[in-house]
Amino acid sequence: MAFPLHSFFKRVLTGTLLLLSSYSWAQELDWLPIPYVYVAKGESLRDLLTDFGANYDATVVVSDKINDKVSGQFEHDNPQDFLQHIASLYNLVWYYDGNVLYIFKNSEVASRLIRLQESEAAELKQALQRSGIWEPRFGWRPDASNRLVYVSGPPRYLELVEQTAAALEQQTQIRSEKTGALAIEIFPLKYASASDRTIHYRDDEVAAPGVATILQRVLSDATIQQVTVDNQRIPQAATRASAQARVEADPSLNAIIVRDSPERMPMYQRLIHALDKPSARIEVALSIVDINADQLTELGVDWRVGIRTGNNHQVVIKTTGDQSNIASNGALGSLVDARGLDYLLARVNLLENEGSAQVVSRPTLLTQENAQAVIDHSETYYVKVTGKEVAELKGITYGTMLRMTPRVLTQGDKSEISLNLHIEDGNQKPNSSGIEGIPTISRTVVDTVARVGHGQSLIIGGIYRDELSVALSKVPLLGDIPYIGALFRRKSELTRRTVRLFIIEPRIIDEGIAHHLALGNGQDLRTGILTVDEISNQSTTLNKLLGGSQCQPLNKAQEVQKWLSQNNKSSYLTQCKMDKSLGWRVVEGACTPAQSWCVSAPKRGVL
């Protein structure tokens, strides 16, 4: 039971205290400093606090987590003493915002990290003090840059601090926009892509970010917006400098469009220049070879020992059939040099002609360094999936897929290619079916990271595969007669065991096929091109044809040297044999005193 105050005394003190407390901080109660007495007998603490506020004509908001019972007599000279006493007894924390008294449990005290972009922590503190929200009892810890503030306190106090910070940021931002000018600049890209690139394979997709997206992530913590460029929706974000600052990608120009303050433009230029760098071109050829397990010795390969390469280095190739070696070493791959690979492929071609080997697939993929590339040759069949009330078709995809991300590692004059490889090879087993006649799919997945030296190839193998083929032979007409026809039919089953090899041949492409054709002596290569079985940088026949076309008369070779010099490239001549005379071949490279007919590239700035 509470004892109320005299109404006249209350009105006189109220007007006086309101004048004195207009600039006070939030920790002081601006209530009448008159005694408060309350006697409780097993009453709810919530009711006690609500009655306490009503006695002073004030609104009190009590947390739902306060559900204690109170017994005893409370006598205090002023309301703040009573509040401090009851808070220490029942582990409470209170906060007064000037109008409403909020009371919480100590366990409800939380922390917030406030990020400031336009203003500083000192400005936020001054704004809180001016508005009467500031409470020194609660935590306040800014960082050295004055842009991050760690605040702790009851929920209502944290809400007011965050609202004040947001209002201050908006006010500072509007003020800077009215006084600061904006500039617009276009930065064209030569090598990198301005917009994002999406790679689709099977049911997945991977987004390769462009330069615009990278800049947005680095320069901005703002919410991503959508900006339309050439009828394409491109994610954009406001930079930290201003809400009007934008970084946009223009796919038609392959350029970055920046709108921001002029003093920030050099920073954008430095970042874009650092990101717009040329990348090496890398070609990867994948050969999938099946070899009859009974004919492995025809390859000249001891699968438990290795391959003798051209440099007499022994290369061990582990297989799934060699359980002891796999258990001890755990490796399924190896590296071979060019001579060892040529020997292996020659034996594979011989076995293929005899029907004991088969090159299942040989895709070739060209990509840039650090750019993911995918080649997928697959088939899809659909299976009906029936539920309780619905039915749908589910696609089952299988085939050959090569996904890779290459990277060139250079140490001095030595170069290596780091390959992040994902190879998936699947096929439908013949004469096999599972539940409800659904065919069985055999799938082999290789996911690895390998470092391959210049001129080397990676062999991953061997994976044993058992194939069952069923053949039916019969006498015409007689074999179709019911019952009796069984005497004129014969069903035979043949089990064939093969070893599957994955041969990966990476290669750094300097100029490509078009460069070799441009350096030719003008002879007609159309007839020779028709005899080439494969148009790629991996084709031996094509390389021989192009190598012969480079041998030309001296005057033609000097014209090529002149053209190279105009393109800032040095070159020298070496002798070669033409049909009926000696010729000259142009070789790109730096000039040395020992080389003849050498033309150096002109120095920059010198005509």
Curated annotation (Swiss-Prot):
Which Gene Ontology terms describe the biological processes this protein takes part in? protein secretion by the type III secretion system
Highest taxon, organism lineage: Bacteria
**Subcellular compartments:** Cell outer membrane
Identify the main location.
membrane
Example of a GO cellular component annotation carried by this entry: type II protein secretion system complex
The effect of disrupting this gene, in the record's words, is: Mutant does not secrete Yop proteins.
User: What up-regulates or down-regulates this gene?
Assistant: The SctC complex is found in cells grown at 37 degrees Celsius, but not in cells grown at 23 degrees Celsius. Detectable in cells grown in the presence of Ca(2+), although less abundantly than in cells grown under Ca(2+) depletion.
The UniProt keyword set, sorted, is: Cell outer membrane, Membrane, Plasmid, Protein transport, Signal, Translocation, Transport, Virulence
One Pfam family hit = T3S_SPI-1_N0
Any one Gene Ontology MF annotation carried by this entry is: identical protein binding
Which positions make up the signal peptide? Answer: 1-26
Please describe the quaternary structure of this protein.
The core secretion machinery of the T3SS is composed of approximately 20 different proteins, including cytoplasmic components, a base, an export apparatus and a needle. This subunit is part of the base, which anchors the injectisome in the bacterial cell envelope. Forms a stable homooligomeric complex. The complex is composed of 12 subunits. Interacts with the pilotin YscW/SctG, which is important for localization and efficient oligomerization of SctC. Interacts with the inner membrane ring inner protein YscD/SctD.
* Domain comment, as recorded: The oligomeric secretin consists of an outer membrane ring connected via a thin cylindrical wall to a conical, periplasmic region that exposes N-terminal petals connected by flexible linkers. These petals harbor the binding site of YscD/SctD, a component of the inner membrane ring.
Say what the protein does: Component of the type III secretion system (T3SS), also called injectisome, which is used to inject bacterial effector proteins into eukaryotic host cells. Forms a ring-shaped multimeric structure with an apparent central pore in the outer membrane. It may serve as an injectisome assembly platform. Essential for the export of Yop proteins.
Q: What further fact does the record state?
A: The secretion channel formed by SctC remains closed in the absence of the other components of the T3SS.
Into which family does the record put it?
A: Belongs to the bacterial secretin family. T3SS SctC subfamily.
Name of this chain's protein: Type 3 secretion system secretin
Organism this protein belongs to: Yersinia enterocolitica
